[in-house]
Design a protein with these regions (language model features):
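Short, conserved active-site loop motifs that form the nucleotide-linked donor/cofactor pocket
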Residues: 3, 30, 59, 114, ...
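Active-site environment of divalent metal-dependent phosphoester hydrolases
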Residues: 12-14, 40-42, 66-72, 109, ...
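Acidic, His/Gly-rich catalytic cores of divalent-metal-dependent hydrolytic chemistry
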Residues: 131-276
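Glycine-rich phosphate-binding loop signature in dinucleotide/nucleotide-binding domains
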Residues: 23-28, 55, 111, 219-220
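Active-site-proximal beta-strand elements of phosphoester/diester hydrolases
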Residues: 2-10, 114-120, 244-245
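N-terminal active-site segment of His-dependent metallophosphoesterases
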Residues: 1-51, 68
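Active-site neighborhood of phospho(di)ester-bond hydrolases with catalytic His/Asp-centered motifs
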Residues: 6-7, 33-36, 61-64, 225-228, ...
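Active-site neighborhood of divalent metal-dependent phosphoester bond hydrolases
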Residues: 46-49, 54-169
């Protein structure tokens, strides 16, 4: 039995199918994890989502920002953006079944010493903090206030954690850490401007930022964390236990599988989506 973790697919079904065939994925004995962002910007969003739903007993995923955005658009909490191409899902006869399934997926997963999130874990949180706070958002997605949360989750404020936060502002910063974060200060203040492999100077006025996984005193130091979201890293980090798997498939770079038991990476080249 093997467990494979796939990076951000974003609707690129063909390279995903190619890698499944290349590793001889057997759903009767193998497992697939996903760092999220199953959909959006790629050509075959509905096919990716249907595959995951059909194999839901053998897959473990965490929600990414694009998955959350689909939920918001589908319930009318948000209008589609210019770059979205979610129509194949929104017009599908099985959309309600597929999107409801997404609502019950986690924002963080921990198993056998490995933590998986979409974007990262702020340096001021432990793994248990992460799981507990992810549950707060999961509870909102599955409850009566779901539409309110999906409306209020957009925005950059507050841009740093405070234990006293409550309500939708608390849920927003949790969501931003787990699904949007790249750079932050050592105390967890988010830099929403920098997206490349190097930070933009003074993106956070008067503060030094670094990739969330590079902070020497982060509370998850030494623990294995698998994440996606950050395509410009091309899977490279300065910490062997911070395993980045977004290798920019939808941007015309590559899709990556990571074999959990061996650390082996399997990649295939991708064509750039016309929706980028």
């Amino acid at each position: 039995m093997s467990t494979y973790v796939v990076g951000d697919i974003q609707g690129c079904f063909e390279p995903f199918q190619y890698l499944l065939e290349r590793v001889k994925f057997n759903p009767d004995k193998d497992r697939l994890w996903s760092v999220g962002d199953l959909i959006n910007r790629g050509p075959d969003n509905i096919e990716v989502l249907r595959w995951f739903y059909a194999h839901r007993d053998n897959v473990t995923m965490v929600l990414g920002n694009h998955d959350l955005h689909l939920m918001a658009v589908s319930c009318g909490a948000r209008k589609p953006s210019r770059k979205d191409n979610l129509e194949d899902i929104l017009d599908a006869p099985d959309r309600e079944q597929l999107i409801e399934w997404l609502h019950f997926q986690p924002l963080a997963h921990f198993e056998d010493g490995v933590t998986m999130v979409h974007a990262g874990i702020p340096p001021i949180w432990t793994v248990q903090d992460t799981l507990d706070r992810a549950w707060e958002v999961e509870n909102a997605l599955q409850g009566a206030r779901c539409e309110e949360f999906l409306t209020e989750m957009y925005g950059n404020d507050p841009h740093v954690w405070d234990d006293s936060l409550s309500g939708m502002t608390r849920l927003r910063v949790i969501t931003n850490y787990l699904t949007r974060m790249r750079y932050c200060t050592r105390k967890g203040k988010l830099d929403f401007v920098s997206k490349g492999p190097q930070p933009i100077p003074d993106a956070v006025a008067g503060k030094k930022v670094a990739p969330w996984f590079s902070h020497k005193r982060r509370l998850t130091k030494g623990q294995t964390i698998i994440f996606g979201h950050w395509a410009s890293l091309e899977g490279m980090t300065d910490d062997p236990k911070a395993i980045g798997l977004d290798t920019g498939c939808v941007w015309g770079n590559a899709l990556t599988f990571y074999e959990l038991e061996t650390g082996r990476r399997i990649t295939c080249e991708c064509a750039k989506s016309v929706h980028i």
